[in-house]
Amino acid sequence: MPSKRSYKTINFLLSVLLLMIYSCGQLEVASIEIVNLFDPSDDEYSLPDTEIVEGPASGITLDSSSSTVTWRHSDPNYHYDPTHEVDYAERIYYRYRLNTATWSPWYNGINLIERQLGFWAFDTLSGLHVLQFDYLEDINYQLEIMSKYPTNIQEENWPDISFFVDVYEGTELLISPGQVFADSGGIFFVNAKLIDVTDFMGMHLDVSYDNSFMQLQNYYLESDSTDFLLQSEGQLINFVNNDPQNGHFQLDLGVAGGSVTGISGTGNIVRLVFEHIGEIGQRSITISSESSVRDVYNNSVVEHIFPGVVSIW
């Protein structure tokens, strides 16, 4: 039977062993370097700075009506790295605007994965934000993208890109803007627009939309449309068939008079004001092939008809 001295010796050795294990643990914890790249006091901290990886550059002319823009932080320390304990790429917030004074909501990669917007996504394999623009018109565009950290430190000199789209020749009848971005439950508008028309005298416009996603609240000939249409001294005559229950809008419009001339140029015809009522995502507003544009000789002059798309944040 072990003596009391043996028990004391065993207890002493166990105490020494536990102390050594504890000390090693303390040393191991102390050796871990804590990094927080969102903390300005961190040695590797960088200010928010957006780098456009792919997309139109300032001053160029696109020969396509669609474009994809991808971006990330300019500092590689903030790029996606599977060895990092914190994925900084997915936690940085971004917002953008295209030809408007209204910014998109702030979304980071985590938000975008949850929302599944379709037109704006976060690529978890590359850590890139991907934004798709469709139905771009033959006009000038200005795109801005801004970032901020979860600490609300915002980018001060964000990318501001101006580019031009030139794709089609001839008379166009289209929904403008071709891609509308709007808040869920919000009010937005589109125009039915003519581009590069010569001697315009009348038209039949047939528009369809998903009335479970949006409801037509109002329609009118806006001031710049009226200015465009009243280039001629003739009388403006219009007939409207509005069927919101079936998501259908028709307009017959003509310039009447004894010796009036046709209208030439580019301008909006009618503004359609909608309210979003459905889920988030995208839906089209289409102009049917039955729509027509006629000149003073009653010739059909429209060469291209384009729909639009509504993208809800």
Language-model features: locations:
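Detector for Asparagine
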Residues: 11, 36, 77, 99, ...
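Residues embedded in well-ordered secondary-structure elements
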Residues: 13, 60, 83-85, 122, ...
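Hydrophobic helical h-region of N-terminal Sec-dependent signal peptides
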Residues: 14-18
